[in-house]
Design a protein with these regions (language model features):
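Polybasic, low-complexity Lys/Arg-rich tracts in intrinsically disordered regions
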Residues: 14, 18-20, 49, 53-54
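Structural signature of Gram-negative outer-membrane beta-barrels, strongest in the C-terminal barrel
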Residues: 2-12, 16-17, 30, 58-247
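N-terminal, post-signal-peptide metal-ligating segments of extracellular/periplasmic oxidoreductases
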Residues: 24
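Short loop/turn hinge sites at secondary-structure boundaries
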Residues: 9, 17-18, 38, 46
Length: 247
């Protein structure tokens, strides 16, 4: 009936705590095309006059750049065709600075009462991320991480980070700077996200040919080919908003 309208529901009601009733980007949650280009920070923080989060998601606007040069020349009967294609791809969006952290976490070299009183193994560097038994009220360190390399509480390298999770009661818990904010679902975009780093690919192409008889020629070529990333590499802010409910 006409008396019902989707605008009766706030964005968070339509997102339904992670069991989303709508899917959108480039439009607002009620299906109206956006006239602005909201940032990722806007998605997590921007509110309307009634205090409802707008949850606006910008359209996906990757930047593709490509160039090609080619030259053909001959040396006696040997004909060369040489070229170079350069492709540059910029997803033009934010990505996590550390793919394992949605909230800022302490590293070994930072000074807190908890870390100052901790017994840190000699194999652990100052830049290693600290994992604890309880993110809200840590009492013991259960592991460390250096990029993709994980260590247990004794500083021994481990191949399975689930061992760190088991030591924390079944869930990996980094030593968070703001555990209260993380528990409330706050995401500090400026602290944990960064701009996507554009990728540049160089693709040489070399071909040559020469006659091997009056009626036949020999041809050979070498080239490097790449494929542009698919649309599926678009960042999905809703996934991060409800990550705790979806894992």
């Amino acid at each position: 009936p006409d008396i019902f309208d989707i605008k009766m529901f706030s964005p968070d009601e339509l997102l339904n705590s992670g069991s989303s009733l709508v899917y959108y980007y480039g439009y607002d949650i009620h299906g109206n095309k956006l006239t602005s280009n909201p940032t990722l920070k806007d998605f997590f923080e921007k509110q309307d006059s009634d205090g409802n989060y707008l949850r606006e998601i910008a359209s996906f606007q990757p930047i593709y750049t490509a160039g090609y040069i080619q030259d053909k020349f001959a040396i006696d009967d040997l004909i060369f065709n040489i070229g170079l294609r350069v492709d540059r791809y910029d997803a033009n969006q934010k990505v996590l600075s550390d793919k394992y952290l949605l909230h800022q976490a302490y590293t070994v070299g930072e000074s807190t009462d908890f870390l100052n009183n901790a017994d840190i193994p000699s194999t652990i560097g100052n830049g290693y991320v600290v994992y604890v038994d309880d993110a809200s009220n840590p009492s013991a360190i259960v592991g460390y991480r250096d990029n993709e390399t994980w260590y247990n509480a004794d500083g021994l390298q481990i191949s399975d980070p689930l061992l760190v999770a088991e030591a924390a009661g079944g869930q990996i818990q980094p030593y968070l700077v703001d555990p209260e904010g993380a528990s409330a679902g706050e995401v500090k975009v400026d602290q944990v996200f960064e701009d996507y780093e554009p990728e540049t690919i160089f693709m040489p192409r070399i071909a040559f040919s020469f006659p091997i008889s009056d009626e036949a020629q020999f041809f050979a070529h070498y080239d490097v080919l790449t494929q542009r990333p698919p649309q599926s590499n678009r960042l999905e802010p809703v996934d991060y908003l409800f990550m705790a409910d979806r894992v």
